[in-house]
């Protein structure tokens, strides 16, 4: 599972008994942003979205307001709504926040009761196997998806819906930056090794080590991304 829709839910528009139309439209737009179809800086045309989905502009407007509150789009007076472009300082702040979140989740995961921890470890085993396979194929998109599954499984294991929501907002915003900068091939083998260490700590029920490794992993990942971006812009 990923912390955002992986497919545009347009087919659900015919059945809104359990979900508000605005939320379905929000998920539709969000899925397109996360897939990179609506890139950072691109204007989202409200009438076009409404016409494509065969609905009025009211739920589209509500959906865009929800996305703005999540930090994914920005509204500019007399210009419209645009997919947000992150400044480097914002990215650094988000990574600092994510490191705190991941450390907390790692500590909680390492302290789970045995049965719950074993269930989590099965999911993490599958995700690390997927990362390893993607790394061998040099499949950056596949690797990133498995990486997200790994971290999201740990976050969900905390069992705190508000924490999961806050983490989701941070990861979604960081994903904008990845799309914006098209970072590729980010030392996947080294990253797999870091995930293996985290997995071993959680499997052993070592909450303190899980916490430390999760924070270190996020800081190291940020450093790798920054170094690659610096090299690309220095060419």
What is the predicted role of each segment?
Residues 87, 139, 205-206:
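Acidic/polar helix N-cap motif
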Residues 94, 98, 116-179, 193-200, ...:
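Conserved amphipathic alpha-helical segments that form helical-bundle/coiled-coil interaction surfaces
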Residues 20, 121-122, 186-189:
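Short helix-capping and inter-helix turn/linker motifs at the boundaries of alpha-helical repeat units
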Residues 1-111, 222-235:
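Short linear motifs at protein or domain termini
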Residues 29, 52, 186-235:
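C-terminal regulatory/effector modules of DNA-binding transcriptional regulators
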Residues 33, 109, 113, 135, ...:
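Hydrophobic residues in alpha-helical segments
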Residues 110-111, 159, 183:
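Short helix-capping/hinge motifs at transmembrane helix termini and TM-loop junctions
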Residues 87-88, 177-181:
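Short alpha-helical transmembrane interface motifs in multi-pass membrane proteins
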């Amino acid at each position: 599972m990923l912390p955002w829709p992986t497919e545009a839910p347009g087919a659900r528009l015919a059945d809104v008994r359990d979900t508000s139309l605005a939320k379905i439209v929000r998920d539709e737009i969000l899925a397109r942003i996360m897939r990179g179809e609506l890139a950072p800086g691109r204007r989202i045309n409200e009438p076009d979205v409404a016409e494509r989905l065969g609905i009025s502009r009211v739920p589209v407007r509500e959906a865009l307001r929800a996305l703005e509150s999540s930090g994914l789009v920005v509204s500019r007076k007399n210009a419209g709504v645009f997919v947000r472009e992150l400044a480097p300082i914002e990215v650094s702040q988000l990574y600092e926040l994510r490191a705190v979140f991941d450390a907390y989740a790692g500590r909680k995961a390492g302290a789970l009761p045995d049965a719950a921890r074993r269930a989590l470890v099965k999911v993490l085993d599958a995700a690390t196997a997927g990362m390893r396979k993607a790394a061998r194929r040099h499949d950056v998109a596949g690797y990133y998806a498995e990486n997200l599954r790994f971290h999201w499984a740990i976050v969900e294991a905390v069992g705190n819906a508000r924490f999961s929501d806050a983490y989701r907002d941070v990861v979604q915003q960081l994903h904008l930056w990845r799309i914006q900068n098209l970072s590729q091939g980010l030392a996947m083998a080294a990253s797999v090794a870091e995930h293996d260490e985290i997995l071993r700590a959680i499997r052993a029920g070592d909450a303190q080590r899980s916490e430390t490794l999760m924070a270190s992993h996020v800081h190291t990942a940020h450093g790798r991304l920054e170094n690659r971006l610096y090299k690309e812009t220095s060419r």
